[in-house]
Regions:
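Solvent-exposed loop and edge beta-strand segments that line ligand/cofactor-binding
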Residues: 1-13, 51-62
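Alpha-helical support elements that line or immediately flank enzyme active sites
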Residues: 13-26, 72
Length: 208
């Protein structure tokens, strides 16, 4: 219906970028997002963000744009309709884009992560409800798990393997790949972005 409506009066909003993110196609997502963004800024002629092909733009377009960004950064979908949600960090993120984020996942998990030069640095998970946490391993090696700043266990897992562990309410879990520590990233900042991360001695990794 969206496609047909767009052909008739151009009053439609494509969800292609959201679908691409759900499918894990990061580089395609980057191209689609850039293309959609450029329709508002062609030659600088549309500073008020009016669509460059008409004098209006359907409001849902802005929502699908932000939804695609979030799905590219973090997903917590269940593999089946009656399954449990599984967290995936940077499941569909363009390889050339460095990024940091903090987003809420299902079952009350506040997830933070960072990627730079195509390398995911860590995964921090704040458990707000104390539920069982399920995460796909973003690395091609084993993972070290820290609980509230203390090294707790090593998880033998390969890339994209399912990792499952219990959490307590308000517990902070940090996952790093084998051979690294959370302290390496306590004050890390992306070299391609002009901002700073403030350190806090009461937590492994703090964002502002």
């Amino acid at each position: 219906n969206q496609f047909e409506g767009t052909k008739v009066d151009q009053n439609g909003s494509s969800r292609f970028h959201v679908d691409v993110a759900k499918l894990g196609l990061g580089d395609d997502l980057g191209r689609i997002l850039n293309t959609q963004y450029e329709v508002f800024t062609v030659n600088g002629d549309t500073p008020n963000l009016i669509f460059d092909q008409r004098d209006y733009y359907s409001a849902e377009g802005y929502g699908t744009f932000s939804a695609a960004l979030q799905d590219g950064l973090n997903q917590s979908l269940a593999p089946t309709t009656d399954g449990d949600p599984v967290i995936r960090v940077f499941p569909a993120w363009p390889k050339a884009w460095d990024a940091k984020y903090k987003l809420l996942a299902k079952d009350g998990f506040l997830v933070s992560s960072s990627i730079e030069s195509e390398e995911i640095q860590y995964v921090e998970i704040e458990s707000q409800l104390g539920e069982t946490c399920r995460v796909r391993n973003p690395w091609d090696c084993s993972v070290v798990l820290y609980r509230n700043g203390v090294k707790a266990e090593s998880i033998e897992a390969g890339e994209n393997d399912l990792m499952e562990f219990e959490t307590s309410e308000n517990e902070v879990i940090v996952l790093v790949k084998e051979g690294t520590t959370p302290d390496q990233y306590r004050t890390s900042e992306l070299t391609s972005v002009d901002y700073h991360t403030v350190n806090d001695t009461e937590s492994n990794i703090i964002y502002t």
